[in-house]
Swiss-Prot record:
Lineage: Bacteria, Bacillati, Bacillota, Bacilli, Bacillales
Keywords assigned by UniProt, alphabetized: Aminotransferase, Pyridoxal phosphate, Pyruvate, Transferase
Lineage: superkingdom: Bacteria
A matching Pfam family: Aminotran_5
Function: Involved in phosphonate degradation.
Biological processes annotated in GO: organic phosphonate catabolic process
Enzyme Commission no: 2.6.1.37
Oligomeric form and interacting partners: Homodimer.
This protein's name: 2-aminoethylphosphonate--pyruvate transaminase
Organism: Bacillus cereus (strain ATCC 10987 / NRS 248)
């Protein structure tokens, strides 16, 4: 277990290593050449994680939570006469819809139940019927439940019908192998405090260069102007337009080095996947059932159904916190659930200790 007051079993912010925390003990200037060079290195490393066709893509770092980066994409990429199709089966897909509505972007929704993946057949029907759609957005890992959505099929469809593809990979990038060139993703969005195991403070967009260049002058916000942010970073050696989170960037750079040391995304995926399978197997032994079908389940976070009407999540939460663990409440409307994440600096021994603690506090007949 990492040295910490408790272990975060959440989808981010998450438990970070001691070495990631330690680099934040120092202060840096945003104009320093060494710092800006580090920003450029971070941008390049992210592209190399995302695809082998590195020359076709670029990275934009954006201050704020991951949602800021999603909104930067929605508000900058879609022109005034554009129309967005959003595939949603959870809170984060709904949030994209809300962004589009707030920004007065024409939006249509493909909705499935929260425990079911995006329906590719329905998506194609919508694309066939509505020729005005220009962009399609989907959440890869919907952390509302932990479900994985079929981005391969949806992006393939998007390109078949000539659409720009936007993927919210907030809780999957760095933990699940993705080649955005192979998948034909034009814009992929993620955040520092997810599978790369940094801390909160900025998100990032990995964009296809030729699509990003079309975004100039389209932004509906000054601070969330994706093109202007990129142009400044690109032309001024990693400079941010406005004050950047220097401590967070250094922590993220350290986290990237640690990802490489672990063996890259494939090795990290294997650790997360082993954590998740161990978690489910041990939770089943003490009477808890996962919400999502195994074939759609991500290695990121798992939703468990309340076992009985008498089950008291708040009591379990408080008991686990006293034992050094923090888990997540449920976030769906039709079924009572709670969620346990297994990303971050979390290992098999941590999962075993967690379930031992749950078993101690809950007796299920």
């Amino acid at each position: 277990m990492t040295e910490n007051h408790y272990l975060l079993l959440t989808p981010g912010p998450l438990t970070t290593t001691k070495t990631v925390k330690e680099v934040m003990l120092y202060d840096w200037c945003t104009w320093d050449v060494e710092y800006n060079t580090m920003v450029q290195d971070v941008r390049a490393k992210l592209v190399s994680l995302a695809t082998k066709e590195e020359e076709k893509y670029t990275t934009v770092l954006m201050q704020g939570s991951g949602t800021f980066s999603v909104e930067a994409v929605i508000g900058s990429v879609i022109p005034k006469n554009g129309k967005l199709l959003v595939c949603t089966n959870g809170a984060y897909g709904k949030r994209i819809v809300q962004m589009a509505e707030m920004l007065h972007i024409d939006v249509v929704v493909s909705q499935t139940e929260e425990w079911e993946p995006t329906n590719v057949v329905e998506v194609e029907k919508i694309l066939q019927q509505d020729k005005e759609i220009t962009h399609i957005a989907i959440v890869h890992c919907e952390t509302t439940t932990g479900i994985i959505n079929p981005i391969v099929d949806v992006c393939k469809l998007g390109k078949q019908y000539g659409k720009v593809t936007l993927v919210d990979a907030m809780s999957s990038f760095g933990g699940i192998e993705i080649d955005i060139a192979e998948l034909q993703i034009d814009f992929l969005i993620s955040s520092a405090n997810k599978c790369i195991q940094g801390v909160p403070g900025f998100g990032f967009v990995i964009a296809k260069r030729d699509e990003l260049l079309k975004c100039k002058g389209q932004a509906r916000s000054l601070s969330l102007d994706l093109y202007d942010q990129w142009e400044t970073m690109e032309n001024q050696n990693g400079k941010w337009r406005f004050t950047s989170p220097t401590h967070v960037v250094h922590a993220f750079y350290q986290a990237l080095l640690e990802l490489e040391k672990e063996g890259g995304v494939k090795a990290r995926y294997n650790r997360y996947d082993n954590n998740q399978k161990l978690l489910v197997n041990r939770m089943r032994e003490i009477g808890f059932k996962p919400l999502v079908d195994e074939k759609y389940q991500s290695p990121i976070i798992t939703s468990f159904i309340y076992p009985e009407e008498w089950f008291d999540f708040e009591q379990l939460y408080n008991e686990l916190k006293r034992d050094g663990f923090v888990i997540y409440p449920g976030k769906i409307s039709k079924v009572d659930t709670f969620r346990i994440g297994n990303i971050g600096d979390v290992h098999e021994a941590d999962i075993n200790r967690l379930v031992d603690s749950i078993a101690k506090g809950v007796v299920i007949g």
